Amino acid sequence: MKLRTNAGPLQGTIQVPGDKSISHRAVILGAVAKGETRVKGLLKGEDVLSTIQAFRNLGVRIEEKDDQLVIEGQGFQGLTAPCQTLNMGNSGTSMRLIAGLLAGQPFSVKMIGDESLSKRPMDRIVYPLKQMGVEISGETDRQFPPLQLQGNRNLQPITYTLPISSAQVKSAILLAALQAKGTTQVVEKEITRNHTEEMIQQFGGRLIVDGKRITLVGPQQLTAQEITVPGDISSAAFWLVAGLIIPGSELLLKNVGVNPTRTGILEVVEKMGAQIVYEDMNKKEQVTSIRVVYSHLKGTIISGGLIPRLIDELPIIALLATQAQGTTCIKDAQELRVKETDRIQVVTDILNSMGANIKATADGMIIKGPTVLYGANTSTYGDHRIGMMTAITALLVKQGQVHLDKEEAIMTSYPTFFKDLERLCHD
């Protein structure tokens, strides 16, 4: 598709879709809680729909009523062996978390994904789940999908130190631990997003968080809840950056989730000189509205414990850095290489093809700015965040056109992205 270029100031108010991470976990925990769970504000992107369909195939009744998702949970014992392969589409979250959940079930399943997901390593969940007594395997020593899993009603608790910073691996182990008899401990390398821990407790589960160590004594039963999903800060990030780098822009981003394990991007842009104001902050619900205006920015260093708190925002932060004065250095972000694409290489290649000055490193990027950006022919490469980054980049292009292939990938997390973009350009 041909993208909008040479945009004037962006003006208006935006309500971003529901948080993808929280939406997944609401469905997963609701499916094994006892009673009727109702979810408001659920993201209806393709990844979450993959999770919903997986649980329907596992015998859980899930339907939409009055703009809410209603899940009829029967507890951990209520799941039934699927009659077909579970297709997780493009969703690594679905595959890894559901594998953890099915670890304690007395049946076997085969889990597959699309071409992109089939290139993402699952060894990170295979090894701890095997330690708990699950028969699980993928392709090659990296355990690429498809995964074959035989659950075990007599799971063993483990103490596991994560070799990488991964909320998905942590979550897979905790979901299995809810069904294991005894004390499971997960020790993180760096603190990652804690939605699973928070939602287990919201559903009546018990665990202890002590710094980087999470302790859970199983088995436990969960109780159905009413869940309201806040706006996804990872989706809001695209408008946040657009507002900061397009001259004359002023945007109000409504109802954005600001769980502290996800707010790294806000800290980074403020350090770079961004003018942002928080309105209607609700600290208990961890939700706020964010007013952003065009700002003059300077380069910075992004590394260490900050990385897990903004890992999904790094592509759009890279674009931001191309418009900042000086050098921005992103380090310790090697996890980007095993996302939907090798995001370090793809971001570098796309932005450099449009005139940026970026050097890819083994674990990040070195970005020099500010640079003028030009038109190019490019692709999402099947990665939703790459697609949205490119669409925001195109707004800065004053010379040439920008053509984007495989734009349908954006449906993964933000089905109304282009509609919202057009509205902000016209308000």
Swiss-Prot record:
Binding site for 3-phosphoshikimate: K20, S21, R25, S166, Q168, D312, K339
Catalytic activity of the protein: 3-phosphoshikimate + phosphoenolpyruvate = 5-O-(1-carboxyvinyl)-3-phosphoshikimate + phosphate
Active site: D312 (proton acceptor)
Source organism superkingdom: Bacteria
PROSITE patterns in UniProt: EPSP_SYNTHASE_1, EPSP_SYNTHASE_2
Keywords for this protein: Amino-acid biosynthesis, Aromatic amino acid biosynthesis, Cytoplasm, Transferase
UniProt keyword annotation of Transcription present: no
InterPro entries in UniProt: Enolpyruvate_Tfrase_dom, Enolpyruvate_Tfrase_sf, EPSP_synthase, EPSP_synthase_CS, RNA3'P_cycl/enolpyr_Trfase_a/b
Localization (cell): Cytoplasm
GO MF annotation terms: 3-phosphoshikimate 1-carboxyvinyltransferase activity
E.C. numbers: 2.5.1.19
Chain sites annotated for binding phosphoenolpyruvate: K20, G92, R120, Q168, R343, R385
Pathway as given in its UniProt record: Metabolic intermediate biosynthesis; chorismate biosynthesis; chorismate from D-erythrose 4-phosphate and phosphoenolpyruvate: step 6/7
Cellular component annotations (GO), alphabetically ordered: cytoplasm
A single GO BP: chorismate biosynthetic process
Family membership: Belongs to the EPSP synthase family.
Its job: Catalyzes the transfer of the enolpyruvyl moiety of phosphoenolpyruvate (PEP) to the 5-hydroxyl of shikimate-3-phosphate (S3P) to produce enolpyruvyl shikimate-3-phosphate and inorganic phosphate.
Quaternary structure annotation from Swiss-Prot or TrEMBL: Monomer.
Name this polypeptide is given: 3-phosphoshikimate 1-carboxyvinyltransferase
Organism: Streptococcus pyogenes serotype M18 (strain MGAS8232)
Gene encoding the protein: aroA
